[in-house]
């Protein structure tokens, strides 16, 4: 089964001025990210504003990215939604549309027990073939539900196509616990610590910032693959710098504005991201 690894971009969802999904801009963004060396694409997640998209809009995004990527990068569609029925529909659609796999966030807003969490993923797992990979997605600060190590272990034992997790909370002890699960792929959303997380044993990061500035993230991963720790340390400073730069105002509008400025030639004047271009220029001058 294919996996998420390395630099996995949590893609923004571009919109037209009328508020529709901008398919042309999404095509262009997908091409730009692949041309800059990212390993995997992860649309329709938190950064992709999943809660602002209808089921049909999410299907449009999935189909567009899968088609534009054309097998050049692993495409895992995030399919978690507010209702189980919508989640099920999106998982089945992603499989039928040719995705390499899916991610599914925990149930959101209303609390669930560990047993209910396990049953939820068992149902999702049963909708697709056993060889179609599924990643859990734990972001407790947003979902209101936390996925414990013991629950993740139970899910992987019961669901052979659940092969890993995206964890987006900066709890390093919990990260180490996930890494103890046999044959379990762990990726982290704390992209500021990409280099450190690779050293801990994570397979990569799922990063929104890498959707704006993929180059330093790709450089960190390439240095890691070649065991060049000094180069890795140098590049991680740019990763941290860009991550801080993009954390201006609310994270989704900030990333969307920065991304459209850089890749689509548009600028959202209502979002203060002016320093993004300055840092981009300095990085290109030095590398």
Each model region followed by its residue ranges:
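Short, conserved catalytic or adaptor-binding loops enriched in Gly and charged residues
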Residues: 1, 155, 262-265
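Active-site beta->alpha loop and helix N-cap motifs at the rims of alpha/beta catalytic domains
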Residues: 2-9, 13-144, 154
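Short glycine/serine/threonine-biased micro-segments
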Residues: 4, 8, 43-46, 76-78, ...
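C-terminal alpha-helical cap/extension of soluble enzyme domains
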Residues: 6-14, 32, 36-37, 199-202, ...
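Basic, gly/Ser/Thr/Pro-rich low-complexity segments located predominantly at protein N termini
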Residues: 11, 24, 50-53, 85, ...
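A general structural signal for well-ordered alpha-helical segments in protein cores
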Residues: 26, 58, 62, 87, ...
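Catalytic alpha/beta core domains of metabolic enzymes, predominantly
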Residues: 127-132, 139-247
